[in-house]
């Protein structure tokens, strides 16, 4: 892991969190229990404070940053998909930000909301609970259904389990030169594949 103090502020990481060795945490970063931070994530706490609350995840290639005197927060069980950018915003409890989405300064994503992949949430947007946000700029399409929220929670549970699995089962290695016979497949703990296109 790459941890850097900045002007006396040192990242804080709960011992039950998992931070991938290629992720970078700088300065005023606070990571809660059971958090998963994926490969190549960048958390630059060199201006504002960055907070990942318990059970949340920040996947591969995500970026967190914010202006001075602001907090960029992912609340409890928040789920941030691959390549998303969070800048000076707040993601509510149990909300999901889809892959390659951008959430701008002062925006608030309501609890149990879902931001669709590739969406752009404008600065200052003030969301409410259980909104499905889609597009660039993002607009409220409808309320999140119980089925969608259940699917989101299953996916978040997978990442909470992955944090545990990675703490014990991830190790740097050299690659094999050929595929071994009867190569096993990895399995998750739940069936999280989407049932149909939205």
Curated annotation (Swiss-Prot):
UniProt keyword annotations, A-Z: Repeat, Transferase
Disulfide bond positions: none
Single biological process term from Gene Ontology: carnitine metabolic process
GO molecular function, one term: transferase activity
Keyword Transferase: yes
UniProt region (Disordered), positions on chain: 179-198
Source organism superkingdom: Bacteria
Annotated Basic and acidic residues bias: 180-198
Biological pathway: Amine and polyamine metabolism; carnitine metabolism
Known role: Overproduction of CaiE stimulates the activity of CaiB and CaiD.
Protein family (similarity comment): Belongs to the transferase hexapeptide repeat family.
Protein name per its UniProtKB record: Carnitine operon protein CaiE
Gene that this polypeptide is encoded by: caiE
């Amino acid at each position: 892991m790459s941890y850097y103090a900045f002007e006396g502020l040192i990242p804080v990481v709960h011992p039950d969190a998992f931070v991938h060795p290629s992720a970078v945490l700088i300065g005023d970063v606070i990571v809660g229990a059971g958090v998963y931070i994926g490969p190549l994530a960048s958390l630059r706490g060199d201006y504002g404070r960055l907070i990942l609350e318990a059970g949340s995840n920040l996947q591969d290639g995500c970026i967190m940053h914010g202006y001075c005197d602001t907090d960029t927060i992912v609340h409890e069980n928040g789920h941030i998909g691959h390549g998303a950018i969070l800048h000076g915003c707040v993601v509510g409890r149990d909300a999901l930000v889809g892959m390659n989405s951008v959430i701008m300064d002062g925006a608030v994503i309501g609890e149990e909301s879902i931001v669709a992949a590739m969406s752009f949430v404008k600065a200052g947007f003030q969301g409410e609970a259980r909104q499905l946000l889609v597009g660039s700029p993002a607009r409220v399409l409808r309320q999140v259904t119980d089925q969608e929220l259940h699917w989101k929670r299953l996916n978040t549970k997978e990442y909470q389990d992955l944090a545990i699995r990675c703490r014990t089962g991830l190790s740097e290695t050299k690659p094999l030169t050929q595929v071994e016979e009867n190569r096993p497949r990895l399995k998750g703990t739940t069936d999280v594949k989407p049932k149909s296109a939205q």
